[in-house]
Amino acid sequence: MRVLKPFSRGTQITVGGVVGVALVAGMVYTSPSRPAVAAAWNSVTKSDATPWVGAWGAAVQPPVAGNEDSGQNWSTEGFRNQTVRQVVRVSAGGTRMRVRLSNVFGTRPLRVDGATVGRSAGGALVWPDSLQKVTFGGAAGTVIPPGREAVSDAVPLSTSPLERLTVNLRFTGATGPATFHRFALGSTYRADGDHLSDISADAFGASTDSWYFLSGIDVDSGQADRRTVVFLGDSLVDGVGTTPGADRRLPDGLAERLAVPRPARPFGVVNAGVGTGKLLRDSACGGQSGVGRFERDVLDRPGVRAVIVHLGANDIGAPQMDDPCVRPNPEVSAAELIDGHRRLIRAAHAHGIKAIGVTILPMKGALFPIWDPDAEKARQDVNRWMRTSGEYDAVLDADRVMADPADPQRPRPGYVFMDGLHPNDAGALAIAAALGLDDL
């Protein structure tokens, strides 16, 4: 049994029957016409063997106003008398699915008055006859306390690997500032009033490229074992530099490799990357540090078999930047970063999860000031430790994939985005191809 700390990082609330989870505190159910209230618990029992697979996920962040690098979003204003339509691509298929919602960074109870899910027909369109109601403890809606998360009942909607789904959430009252994921690389749509049952896009005239309250989709694989792979990382994992709407992030590349029928590896891939995220310290735009969110973003996912970690680049580069998004930004030594990685490895191994390290990418030549000789030395020291210590169960050497043969401190020209730092589509695909599937 793993005992959760008192809500400091957000506690998962499960509403309805969930395999492998036992409620310790009581759950309050109401009639289907009224929302179920997700009550707190203080401990859970988790089973290693579960049919649920994490098929999609997002690392949630505190609300923050948009800026020039991420565009505008609706997190600070929240929603009132609106329907929010979000389109995501699942990495694994199953006979049923369920939805995870988060109010981890909310300041008030989040009342979700209704939810539906269906197959995306492109943009805000939904395939006819595919919409299904999502319930919570048999009720049409739920109330999620601040600092908590909720998991829906199982929905009888079958899914296929790499299929796009549409999740619709209805908010009647004001939500307050929204727990969200800032850099979605995909569109979320908003309509005034109740449009949970609409298959057309007519009412959804406003859009943004962030996700709101939606933190995960699980599918029932029908096989009781561990089949979830989680990427924990920064903008490399989040997909900065790849084509918006094209699902070309590093985790997407792995999901596509795993979905190839021969040999099929029916694993789900969850993306827990956060642009500007750090390993050791929280930041204004990156939210919680990697060590601070490891429990929620990795351990609380169902059936996790491996975690793949790329963190530390922003810890190294932030001291050179005068950007409020990355503050606080004190200098961090390689020894401190290695200690942080060791904490993640220990936490993973304590739960029987493989830990795979990803070497930090080349940083020289970026359009923003993140590189100097001291930063390069710290990067090289961390990468050398990853390659030689044997402390990670395996290493994905993204540094060597991305390095320019003519100057290994810089990224390879054909693999880098126009900002001179982040992998483009080709670079992300090359890194995904370098991971040994037998290491998972």
Question: Model-predicted segments: where are they?
Answer:
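Proline-centered loop/turn at the N-terminus of a beta-strand
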Residues: 268, 354-356, 394
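Active-site-proximal beta-strand/loop segments in catalytic clefts of secreted hydrolases
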Residues: 102, 170, 232-235, 271-276, ...
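Active-site segments of SGNH/GDSL-like serine hydrolases
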Residues: 310-315, 344-379
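Catalytic His-Asp segment of secreted/periplasmic serine-dependent ester chemistry enzymes
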Residues: 361-440
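Non-membrane alpha-helical structural segments and their capping/turn regions in soluble enzymes
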Residues: 288, 331-342, 376-380, 425, ...
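Sec-exported extracytoplasmic/periplasmic mature domains
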Residues: 237, 255, 259-263, 299-303, ...
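Conserved SGNH/GDSL esterase-like catalytic core that processes O-acyl groups on lipids
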Residues: 56, 80-86, 109, 115-123, ...
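N-terminal secretory targeting modules
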Residues: 2-232, 242-244
